Amino acid sequence: QNTILRFQTSTINIHKYVIICNKEHEFIVQEQIHSLQLTHEFQIICEPIGRDSAPAVCVASLVDSENTVSLIVPCDHIFDDAKLCSLIEKSSHHCENSVITFGIQPSYPETGYGYIQTNDKNETLGFKEKPDKETAETYMEQGSYLWNAGLFMFQNKTMIQCFEQYAPSILKTCKETLAKSADSNNVIALNKELFETCDAISIDYAIMEPLTTQNNNIKCYTFKYDGKWSDIGSFKTLHDECEQNEDNNTLKGSIITENCENCYIESECAIVATLGVKDLIIVNHRDALLIAHKDQCQDIKKLIAKIPEENEDLKIVHAKAYRPWGWYINVEGNDHSGFKVKRIGVYPGKRLSLQSHNRRSEHWVIVKGKARVQLDDQFIDMSPNEHVYIPVKALHRMENIGTEMVEFVETQIGDYLGEDDIVRYEDDFGRV
């Protein structure tokens, strides 16, 4: 949302926002976009599996007019919005037959970022991998190197030409994927079978490095951004950007500390009490608890990758699941516990599918908003503190007929309570 709002208040002529995300995040992104009440067009491209930035940029270049100017912006960076937008506008006249990049003036010899070498004519001389400490210090001394911010600007036809020249297999696969992908309601769901065959490679390696080292007719320019910037790529950098108390602790939620220093502690579901610790990341959510040293939080991916190896019963299942009509939170119970309790929210004007279940009954208690429940051939308007019982195999549907969220508590009872025990008869989102 902050990334979109950055450009909403600028004078840049925005034609459309294109958001590329994983399929799991589709409904979160939709909810966040709709809550902004945008007047601009938007499109969501859902990847079934991550393939790094090159395929994502390739797909984005193919879905709009070849003469459209595209600006690629990471959503986890912090900028001085006014300075960034001013720089983008000033540099946009270089887009003809060129790829524009933006670099950050280094403030110290960082080894965790890539670097871009440039000259006083803003010509890009090369992209450099994440250096060791000695090399990073040399870059600082030379003064012609900038941190790679991951921002790119180009006409779509120029980027497609780059893929034709340097990564033709990616271009071919992305074209085939788009031809076989579902496209409805501003959402493109990329074909999994085809997209997973695409090479997993960054735009830097696939396109930018050969573009700046081989002779060709496409120019590359780099413009220096010298305002506030941070790449929120870890809990450590998130902590650096958040408000801190006198002990350099960031505390979010119900937190009690004593003699603790330099910690990021967040809890959404329970009191967290810490005593005599420092330099820790503690994140307590409904579905998982993370405790990590700040110096090792870059390795969280390694920890996640070990979960199936350590215990096949450990599954990454989010306690809060998003749907096109709203969300639900699993409060208690599982598929085989005999009962399951959920808290469910429905957006204004939205409704669940007309459905039935073969192996469970349900009890709904309204706790917020104005709801209309269909139960077989009955339609019942309901308010907070009212209850309805839904027998096994009964047709039922929940609809929000008000202007605020409807929230209700659902108690399921049966011998099997999996999400696949559902028969849909009508659905506003094409899931029948």
Tell what function each PLM region has.
Residues Q1-I72, I78-D80:
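Conserved N-terminal catalytic core of the sugar/cofactor nucleotidyltransferase
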Residues L38-Q43, E123, N216-I218:
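A short helix-to-beta-strand connector/capping loop
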Residues A60, D76, I116, Q155, ...:
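Residue-level signal for inorganic ion chemistry
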Residues V73, I366, T411:
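Catalytic metal- and UDP-sugar-binding loop of GT-A-like glycosyltransferases, i.e.
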Residues D81-L194:
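Conserved core of the sugar-phosphate nucleotidyltransferase
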Residues Q161-V388, H396, I401, D415-L417, ...:
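Left-handed beta-helix
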Residues F408:
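Noncatalytic nucleic-acid binding interfaces
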